A protein has these predicted regions:
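Bacterial N-terminal signal peptides that target proteins for export
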Residues: 1-7
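Bacterial N-terminal signal peptides
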Residues: 9-17
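N-terminal prosegments of processed precursors
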Residues: 21-143, 393, 397, 420
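Fold-level signature of zinc-dependent metallopeptidase catalytic domains
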Residues: 130-180, 230-237, 277
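Active-site-proximal segments of metallohydrolase catalytic domains
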Residues: 135-148, 191-307
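Active-site-surrounding "flap" and adjacent substrate/cofactor-binding loops of secreted or lumenal enzymes
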Residues: 165-166, 170-205
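Extracellular hydrolytic enzyme modules, especially secreted metalloproteases
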Residues: 203, 270-442, 450-457
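Conserved small/polar residues in nucleotide/adenosyl-binding loops
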Residues: 466-468
Length: 468
């Protein structure tokens, strides 16, 4: 069937300082076990800057570690705390739970949490950062300046902890991840159907072929939960600093970091830390690191320098997912986070409601999790154009007619219809997406129409304003 979505005001102008970006919470409903052995279905919303677990009908939950139960939350000043009432699915609630829920306003609680999340994100966003001019894409709307055309050197460090190591069947994590990142047509029993290099080569129409260098594993001296510890619901920045510094110092014994300063500006363009265990975005491990992309010299105290170059941006994601913990996770989170490195922003909703966003159609939204992260969708026409991978074919209103819209993945073609009088800041993009190749697990197929309204004020607040 034809599947059509219209996104209005979705993409905000990205002309401000680079943001700290994070993977979205896995919003798919999942069952979690209560202390008495029963199960409740929950959903998680948000990102690194703020997230909340809820019932499927929207009531915020609090996990009480002392009882081992998810309990209905109540608001205490600015934070959630337990009401003491054990949560259950709507059809299984007792009278006490039903009466309690009549007395609370989940909308009011979520509104307060959204304000806090926005404030935290704003602090991360506006600190000054190092920025340099690099060749490649036109950089117009991107939040970073990493080369998106050619074959830049990319450093990936495998990182494990004193109590959490990589769990590969053959005992060779380095060999496994070299294959996952670089082997053409990579397959594995977790459902993998292509390598990271395959993904970016396809999405860029052959214009971007990064040289992935995988090293490690290096083992940090402290525990998994130490580095993933939270403060006010977010990863502690001092522990993240130890995580990055420790990993880079350990890797410096075998790595020449100057190789990864692709333009010679004195900064490593990016260090990717692939860490053992789980991440907080798609699991219930609260004391684990949430996958994210930060700038080290922006958010950490002091600089970090090796081989005459400083560590600039870094990115990280986990080995395992909370959905299938017995197998290595797919490439979806890496492709999402590395797309931040290239300069793309998050396109998922930053609030705790059911805002209409690209969802599974976009790797910068919930497409990260398609086919359990094994088959992220290729980048949209808009994203490709911003990265220098696609040139729009312009249509003139009232003058041009099209009868065939070529499939995006196969043709790398899309149409643009400018809105008169907006000086190129507002336009429609038409693309044809079919459920083949990397797009096999899209929720639908046919034409996607994107209404791009580039607004710096919207981006400043990190909001997706969607009108249908």
């Amino acid at each position: 069937m034809n599947f059509k979505r219209i996104f209005l005001g979705l993409f905000a102008a990205l002309c401000l300082a680079e943001s700290a970006s994070a993977a979205p919470a896995d919003q798919r409903p999942r069952k979690v076990r209560q202390a008495d052995g029963t199960y409740i279905t929950v959903v998680k919303r948000g990102d690194e800057f703020g997230h909340v677990t809820m019932t499927t009908d929207g009531y915020p939950l609090f996990y009480n570690e002392s009882t081992g139960n998810y309990e209905y939350a109540k608001m205490s000043s600015s934070t959630l705390e337990s009401s003491g009432i054990i949560a259950a699915d709507a059809t299984d609630r007792n009278v006490k739970a039903v009466d309690y829920l009549k007395s609370v306003s989940p909308k009011a609680m979520l509104s307060k949490l959204e304000v806090q999340r926005a404030a935290k994100a704003s602090v991360m966003r506006y600190r000054p950062r190092h920025m340099s001019t690099k060749s490649g894409a036109k950089r117009g709307m991107l939040i970073n300046d990493y080369p998106s055309i050619g074959s830049p050197n990319v450093l990936i460090i495998l990182v494990q902890f004193s109590d959490m190591t990589f769990d590969c069947e053959d005992g060779d994590p380095l060999g496994f991840y070299k294959n996952m990142f670089t082997q053409p047509g990579f397959k594995y029993k977790n459902g993998a159907n292509g390598s990271v290099l395959d993904y970016f080569t396809t999405s860029s129409n052959g214009l971007f072929n990064p040289k992935f260098d995988i090293v490690g594993p290096v083992t940090l001296p402290k525990s998994y939960s130490y580095y993933g510890a939270n403060y006010s619901g977010n990863d502690r920045m001092d522990r993240l600093q130890e995580f990055v510094k420790g990993a880079c110092e350990a890797a410096s014994k075998v790595v020449d970091f100057s190789k990864y300063d692709n333009n010679g500006d004195g900064y490593v363009d990016n260090v990717y830390l692939y860490y053992a265990g789980f991440g907080e975005a798609d699991s219930e491990y609260k004391e684990s690191i949430w996958p994210h992309a930060y700038n080290y010299n922006q958010f950490m105290m002091g600089s970090l320098k090796f081989n005459g170059v400083s560590i600039g941006s870094y990115t990280c994601s986990p080995e395992r997912s909370g959905t299938y913990p017995e197998l290595p996770t797919g490439i979806g989170t890496f492709c999402h986070e590395f797309s931040h490195v290239l300069g793309l922003p998050d396109h998922y909703t930053t609030v705790y409601n059911d805002a209409f966003t690209p969802g599974e159609f976009d790797v910068m939204d919930m497409g990260t999790y398609n086919n359990e992260q094994n088959t992220p969708p290729t980048h949209s026409a808009y994203e490709r154009a911003e990265l220098g991978w696609l040139e729009y074919q312009e249509l003139t209103t009232g003058a041009d007619t099209i009868s065939v819209l070529p499939e995006l993945q196969a043709s790398n073609k899309a149409y643009i219809v400018p809105v008169e009088g907006t000086n190129g800041r507002e336009f429609f993009v038409l693309e044809n997406r079919q459920k083949t190749g990397w797009d096999k697990y899209l929720p639908g197929n046919g034409m996607l129409m994107w209404h791009i309204d580039q607004d710096a004020n919207v981006w400043a607040q990190n909001l997706s304003l969607i009108h249908i």
